[in-house]
Amino acid sequence: MDSPDSVRVKCESKGSCSPEEGLNNGLPEEHNQASGGRRRKRPVQRGKPPYSYIALIAMAIANSPERKLTLGGIYKFIMERFPFYRENSKKWQNSIRHNLTLNDCFVKIPREPGHPGKGNYWTLDPAAEDMFDNGSFLRRRKRFKRTDITTYPGYMQNSSAFTPTPTGRASYPNSIYSSVGSGYNPQIHQTHHPAVVHQYYQSPGEAGQGQHRMFSIDSLINQQSLMQPSPGAELTHHSLGLNGNLGNMTNSCSVGDLSCFQTQSISPTGVGSLLNRSSNAVSSNLTYSYSSSPPHLPVPPASYSPNNSQLYGSTSRLAMRSGPCVDHTDQLLSLPGTQINGVCQYNNSSYMRQTHFASGLERYM
């Protein structure tokens, strides 16, 4: 059996027998008793402010006159206000950068062309102004998540060219940042998005008239209709159905007379007069080839764009084809109206029946 002296030597070799030695190690006595030998992983450093990095960034932006700062300006404010961060700047500066990019409450604003310098500006999202309890930077209510990425006009990181120009939101009246958003110029920079080539602004009086959009469906259709060679209507096989004796006449011609295609219900005897009226109006030798359509199709009404009087068709079924269609049109126009028996009536509307084609005419497809 070991003597008491030998036990005391073993205990001293471990270095954790007396409370005095515990105090010499840097930990108080009550800490060792309360934790039961469990040490704190990251002890609190002396002199470190009790604010999180998000609170430090928000504090720096709030104390800025323009409510926006560059990354260097945020570093400067933190080091001037808290002497603790004047040492070991590399560690906490990395944490500041990570918090700026990973938290939705901070918004990046590109630098304006007339203000040379390095780095973009950072500001606080107006919807995140109340994320601290009672204006105190010590406690945050919850993690802020942005619902609208176009908070500021200059923030065009994920926006598209087809979206309307965003406008800045008003700041909250009862907030610690009462003037956030007042020092920003609502300007879209062309260098941030290649498709943004113009800037559209409107005054408060023009807000009720609707906002002009750079790219809209109407403007794209109008530009496409101007590229067409003729402003006339399209005479397609949807509106004229031919039987087997007439042959395969599926090519459509551009006809200058628009009045003869504005009716939706026609009679078999009126088809001949319609063809006679359009015999002198053939003004284009460009043909469009169409795929085979269903056997029963109603006569489509004429459709016009809102801002243009030209008649336009669907762009997905247009395909340029060489060769004039005057010969086929002359053969069609030379027939009387009684021989065209493909017109049928259904619910007071006319539709054309596409019959089988004669042999030997497949080369015109």
Swiss-Prot record:
Q: What Pfam families does the entry give?
A: Forkhead
Q: Which domain of life is it from?
A: Eukaryota
User: Is Transcription regulation given among the entry's keywords?
Assistant: yes
Gene Ontology CC, one term:
nucleus
A single MF term (Gene Ontology) = DNA-binding transcription factor activity
Question: What does the entry give for GO biological process?
Answer: anatomical structure morphogenesis; cell differentiation; lens development in camera-type eye; regulation of DNA-templated transcription; regulation of transcription by RNA polymerase II
What CDD domains does this protein map onto?
A: FH_FOXE
Full protein name: Forkhead box protein E4
- What is the originating organism of this protein? Xenopus laevis
